[in-house]
Amino acid sequence: HFTDKPFKTGKWRTPDNIAAHRAWGRKIEWFESGEYEVAPFTDKVIYTRPIVLLADESTFSCAEDFCVDFLTMKRGRIVGAKTAGSSGNPLMVKLPGEGVALICTKQDFFPDGREYVGFGIDPDIEVKPSIEDIFQNNDPVLQAAIKTILQ
């Protein structure tokens, strides 16, 4: 609902786990998705006014996929801090003492092939709240976003 133009989505890959091949010492084989183009809605209202997307290190999984699509659509700027760099889709492994480990099972890319899993996505405008901001209930990220959208 944010664009009236088609755009390409990110690509991803995941190891093809063939136990016999692993036992034989073969290299990891990969299943790779292709990119595909998303067509805009033709029967719904499209919001075409300016947009600012807020993100930080707590942005991961499908929220990070949304950041990729948002940047690919060229609909606005990302304000905040670098994202977490994890596409989600985790394999859950139970650990002793009721612990759990989550292991990322796929590697995601921008449509142009740039990686963000393990690295994160850099914001266009980096703003991080300080401890003082938090104690004073001040939100410099939101303030920067408002300033950006009004320009």
Residue ranges and their predicted role:
Residues K8, T48-P50, K74-R77, Q151:
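Loop/turn elements at helix/coil->beta-strand transitions in domains of secreted/extracellular proteins
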Residues C62-F66, R75, N138-A145:
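Stable alpha-helical elements in mature extracytoplasmic
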Residues I51, F70, G113, A145:
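Terminal peptide-recognition signature
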Residues V45, E57-S61, E132-P140:
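Soluble non-cytosolic domains of exported or imported proteins
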Residues H1-P50, G88-K94, T105-F109, Y116:
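Gly/Ser/Thr-rich loop/hinge elements
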Residues P50-A55, R77-G80, L102:
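Structural recognition of the beta-strand scaffold that forms the well-ordered cores
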Residues F60, M73-S86:
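Short, well-structured beta-strand/strand-turn elements
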